[in-house]
Amino acid sequence: MSSFSESALEKKLSELSNSQQSVQTLSLWLIHHRKHAGPIVSVWHRELRKAKSNRKLTFLYLANDVIQNSKRKGPEFTREFESVLVDAFSHVAREADEGCKKPLERLLNIWQERSVYGGEFIQQLKLSMEDSKSPPPKATEEKKSLKRTFQQIQEEEDDDYPGSYSPQDPSAGPLLTEELIKALQDLENAASGDATVRQKIASLPQEVQDVSLLEKITDKEAAERLSKTVDEACLLLAEYNGRLAAELEDRRQLARMLVEYTQNQKDVLSEKEKKLEEYKQKLARVTQVRKELKSHIQSLPDLSLLPNVTGGLAPLPSAGDLFSTD
């Protein structure tokens, strides 16, 4: 498991998607590094405010997963998140899509039912959402038409593959080629080819995979050892599944790129075929001129065969000779 650093967390948050797998994988990583709860929540809060509107709700889903699943290990995250949640809920309710209101209310109801936080604090969070509904600046209203939910974005991406290809400028070919090569090179180190991790997973003890073997545990010390092993196995598998999910998306993107690249090459091929035909015609015309020129040259008289018109003849008289009286 990779060590904690703020830059590593920022990178993981930038890659966070709305899928349950992505949220749970990052949640497990954060819980594993719970001794850094303070910096983690600080970075989470900062990145939440910087995130695009259609990703903000996912940040709260992540916080929910971390808060609820870390309670049995300690109160660190529950306490640290409490200090920023009022601002976070207010910010998300104000900046995110209108459709976020119900998920936020549902999340607060769950926290109230499970006593994640006290009733007074839950009420404070609800009030922060209501306060955020005060008339925003005009710029916010103008942005609403541009906001899309994660599902809409996914549907639009799916619509783009493969039927709705839009023709590309053939001159974009070199750029597409570079992008395609990079995508293929990136997949050389894909999760599915990570033999080291696969070997670790294959080497996991049977106890972490078979519930029936739990009956053999008779003392607390053995149970705690197994609990630690299970946590590590869960973290290993969750992270690997997350990498596999990311690889799957990369391969989908590569498939879309291949469709685009193939169409681009077809466009280039069509253009080059026209150019080839054009230059074939030019070659034919130049060849015809060459042939006619050669024939014309052969029809001209050979001046070297003419007699020497100056040899053996007397020189012409000079002007003085013409007017001489002799």
Swiss-Prot record:
Chain ranges of the CID domain: 2-133
Spans annotated as Disordered: 127-149
Keyword DNA damage tagged: no
Modified residues (N-acetylserine): 2
Molecular function terms, GO-annotated: identical protein binding; RNA polymerase II C-terminal domain binding; RNA polymerase II complex binding
Location, primary (coarse class): nucleus
Location relative to the cell: Nucleus
Keyword Nucleus applies: yes
Pfam family, one: CREPT
Record field: compositional bias (Basic and acidic residues): 128-144
GO cellular component terms, semicolon-separated: nucleoplasm; nucleus; transcription preinitiation complex
PROSITE patterns according to UniProt: CID
Modification Phosphoserine, positions: 132, 134, 166, 299
Phenotype upon changing residue 114 to A: Complete loss of binding to POLR2A CTD in vivo
Quaternary state and interactors: Homodimer. May form a heterodimer with RPRD1A. Associates with RPAP2. Associates with the RNA polymerase II complex.
Cited function: Interacts with phosphorylated C-terminal heptapeptide repeat domain (CTD) of the largest RNA polymerase II subunit POLR2A, and participates in dephosphorylation of the CTD by RPAP2. Transcriptional regulator which enhances expression of CCND1. Promotes binding of RNA polymerase II to the CCDN1 promoter and to the termination region before the poly-A site but decreases its binding after the poly-A site. Prevents RNA polymerase II from reading through the 3' end termination site and may allow it to be recruited back to the promoter through promotion of the formation of a chromatin loop.
Name of the featured protein: Regulation of nuclear pre-mRNA domain-containing protein 1B
Species: Homo sapiens
